[in-house]
Design a protein with these regions (language model features):
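Conserved short loop/turn motifs at secondary-structure junctions
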Residues: 116-123, 284-288, 311-318, 350, ...
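Short beta-alpha connecting loops at secondary-structure transitions
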Residues: 227-232, 451-458, 467-478
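A glycine-rich phosphate-binding loop feature that marks nucleotide/adenosyl-phosphate handling sites
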Residues: 262-264, 300, 343-354, 504-517
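Extended redox/cofactor-interaction regions of prokaryotic respiratory oxidoreductases
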Residues: 127-205, 209-216, 239-243, 329-439, ...
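Glycine-rich phosphate/diphosphate-binding loops that line cofactor/substrate pockets in enzymes
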Residues: 93-113, 169-179, 273, 294-307, ...
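N-terminal export/assembly segments and adjacent metallocofactor-ligating motifs
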Residues: 1-252, 281, 289, 403, ...
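Long, contiguous, secondary-structure-rich segments that constitute the structural scaffold
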Residues: 473-528, 596-606, 612-709
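Short acidic-glycine loop/turn motifs at beta-strand connectors
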Residues: 35-41, 547-548, 626-627
Length: 709
């Protein structure tokens, strides 16, 4: 779809020619070559000269022009008046929002104003480099983000083992010979907490050089096609399997700790912790045979260059924190941590750890009011948000600011949160769409985004498989009545504190100047394809930020959580549990409003193994029930999921009224999070345990034809 230049919402035309920038729609940050003719985008291709993505592009990157031209996108502030929306001028909108926030804060206290930041907050450098100052100006401890939906266990393990939440070991996939993946589907995600664009070719290259790619997952995913070995594993049992691997490593004296021996502490405690979890002890629970476990442990330990990696399937379960700790520990004790071809730490040009203090405390400094759940890195678990709004008393949340988030679809028990949002005294959303969450806002402040904004990937260079740097210039100018995200934050901060913010470009320039790469912002602007800073390099102990300067193999919180895990060995598995499903043409709840990404058959299907689908037929509508709710979805019978497992994609559920998402509404689907349970969490980290939700599946009652039919 191309914009009509006469339309009142049309953007100013872009200058004709070739434009280069990074796609910021997922973690792969692929370089793009964008052709503009007649003031509009006529072609989008992968940039072959980008040193990280090397010409790779996925369907999302090709759809960037469609997002830019989306007629449903908001560009000026909107105020809800009754059941309709009216436009506002920017100054009036910012004045009104600041006054409402100030009033709630003065009457109920700073913590009565909560914030929720969605994943796009870290995909946009303007927000990432400005939102922190806004949060500080609010002075509220009621901070919630998408982190505690799907990745908090990574950061918890990084803080406990290495001293900082952003110290996350990343697989050196381009030089490894044994890649062990668990609960990861990089063919759909393009790599997550592993920025690895073109992962298909990288996996094929491992096999081409004689290496192994081993994948364990409850579902035989798209990534399994590029694995040498695939094994089903029951949801929520990954920590048991990882302990069994460690058990075999220690029992067979396969540990290799010489290169980090003077840095690591807790080796004996880790060995003792793994002792009860023999491959035979866990095989009935995990579904992975003891023989397979022993062979994998021995082969992984013996490989000269190997990396273990666990992603979302390990994080969104009841033992996510233990899983991510054990992945790191396995790499460490086999000599594959901070080693070429193993799990390594990137060295980004703009380094968020540059000013970090060693020995800082990152969790448990305050707790939620209702359930007493601990904060981590200043954030509270999002499973508590609805109850903190709905439960009366001192500290009750009375106002909410959402930033690029749609928690009604992304947080467990979205129906409860939907009800909670309707009870707020005031809500403002910094978001370009009227979606399932922002429909509850009293004011929407839409920022410019995508092809209109300058961008540097601050976060994802910390997770990349190669050190590079790239600055993206805008393709399109914004209209006079539009605002960048940092201008919105600056306007609110000035009204709340009287102080102005530094611009993201100023902060980026300062960070680069003080970084180790020697690059300046001008250098990046002069190199539109990006700058190659080389492969990952060993960096320990210098990169560690623990109080003692050591790597902690057996942190006390992890050891204290092991009895909870051990108790599961005596518990029978649930008859049927639900897991999620990533899809290449979307990212969580994003991009369902883009027509070219929604083509083809219905993607919001529930997958069942034939053993669990007796009496049901492929394609029929089924009723799925959990403790908290029920939905209907078309049934897909497939042996790609193991028995006892149902699989449903997340991010759908666009049938709620009051939104302005015309394409998404035609592909509404059902929300997985109308089934997930906010009481199911990883007790160690507070992360939501959305995988493993017990459910039942039955044939839905016959429904009449819709009016459209």
């Amino acid at each position: 779809m191309t914009p009509d230049p006469t339309h009142p919402h049309a953007s100013p035309p872009a200058p004709d020619g070739i434009h280069y920038r990074a796609c910021n729609l997922c973690e792969a940050i692929c370089g793009l070559k964008i052709t503009v003719q007649g003031g509009r985008v006529t072609d989008v291709r992968g940039d072959p000269d980008d040193p990280l993505s090397r010409g790779h592009i996925c369907p999302k990157g090709a759809a960037l022009p469609d997002l830019h031209a989306d007629p449903d996108r908001l560009k000026t502030p909107m105020r809800r008046v009754g059941d309709h929306w009216e436009p506002m001028e920017w100054d009036a909108a910012l004045d009104h929002v600041a006054a409402q926030l100030r009033a709630v804060r003065e009457q109920h206290g700073a913590d009565a104003v909560a914030t929720f930041q969605g994943n796009p907050s870290v995909h946009n450098s303007g927000t990432l480099l400005s939102a922190g100052a806004f949060l500080k100006a609010l002075g509220s401890r009621s901070r919630y983000t998408a982190t505690s939906i799907d990745q908090l266990p990574h950061h918890f393990a990084g803080a406990e083992m290495f001293g900082h939440p952003l110290l996350l070991p990343i697989p050196d996939v381009d030089r490894t010979d044994f890649f062990l993946m668990m609960g990861a589907n990089p063919l759909a995600s393009n790599g997550s907490i592993m920025t690895a664009p073109g992962i298909r070719d990288r996996l094929k290259a491992i096999r081409a050089r004689g290496g192994r790619v081993v994948l364990l997952d409850p579902r035989r995913t798209e990534s399994a096609e590029y694995a040498t070995d695939f094994h089903h594993i029951r949801p929520g049992t990954d920590a048991l399997f990882l302990l069994a691997l460690l058990n075999e490593v220690f029992a067979s004296s396969l540990q290799r700790t010489a290169h980090l021996g003077g840095v690591m502490t807790g080796l004996d405690s880790l060995k003792a912790a793994a002792a009860p979890f023999t491959p035979e002890a866990v095989e009935a629970r995990t579904g992975v045979s003891a023989g397979v476990t022993r062979e994998l442990a021995r082969a992984f330990a013996a490989a000269p260059r190997a990396a273990a990696y666990g992603r979302i399937g390990l994080s969104i379960q009841e033992f996510g924190g233990l899983c991510q700790w054990l992945v790191n520990a396995l790499n460490a004790v086999t000599g594959h941590l901070d080693a070429v071809g193993g799990a390594m730490f990137p060295a980004p040009a703009f380094d968020l750890l540059a000013g970090a203090k060693a020995g800082a405390t990152h969790h448990g400094r305050h707790h939620t009011r209702v359930r007493g759940l601990p904060e981590f890195d200043g954030e509270l678990p999002n499973v508590a948000l609805a109850e903190e709004i709905l439960t009366p008393g001192d500290g009750q949340i009375r106002a909410l600011i959402t930033v690029a988030g749609n928690p009604v679809l992304s947080v467990p028990d979205g129906q409860a949160l939907d009800r909670a949002l309707g009870s707020l005294d005031f809500m403002v959303s910094i978001d370009p769409y009227l979606n399932e969450t922002t429909r509850h806002a009293h004011v929407i402040l839409p920022p410019a985004f995508g092809l209109e904004v300058p961008h540097y990937d601050v976060i994802f260079h910390h997770f990349a498989v190669r050190n590079t740097a790239r600055y993206s210039q805008p393709v399109f100018p914004i209209r006079p009545d539009q605002r960048f995200d940092f201008q919105i934050f600056d306007g609110l901060v000035q009204r709340l504190t009287g102080r102005a913010l530094a611009t993201p470009e100023q902060r980026l320039s300062a960070g680069l100047t003080h970084g180790r790469s020697g690059l300046t912002l001008d250098d990046l602007k002069a190199n539109p394809h990006g700058v190659d800073l080389g492969p990952l390099q060993p960096c320990l102990p210098g990169r560690l930020l623990t109080a003692t300067g050591e790597l902690h193999l057996a942190p006390a919180p992890m050891l204290a959580d092991l009895p909870r895990l051990r108790a599961t060995l005596d518990q029978p598995p649930e008859p049927l549990v639900l897991i999620g499903r990533r899809q290449l043409r979307s990212n969580n709840s994003w991009m369902h409003n883009t027509p070219r990404l929604m083509r083809g058959p219905d993607r919001c299907t529930v997958q069942l193994n034939p053993a669990d689908a007796q009496g049901l037929e492929h394609g029929q509508t089924v009723l799925i029930r959990s403790r908290v709710g029920e939905i209907t979805a078309p049934l897909e019978i497939t042996d790609t999921v193991m028995p006892g497992v149902a699989c449903l994609p997340h991010g759908f559920g666009h049938a709620r009224g009051g939104t302005r998402l015309s394409t998404a509404a035609r592909h509404a689907g059902a929300s997985l999070n109308d089934l997930t349970d906010p009481t199911r969490i990883d007790a160690l980290t507070g992360n939501a345990a959305v995988n493993g939700t017990p459910i039942t599946v039955h044939a839905a009652e016959q429904v009449g034809e819709s009016a459209a039919d």
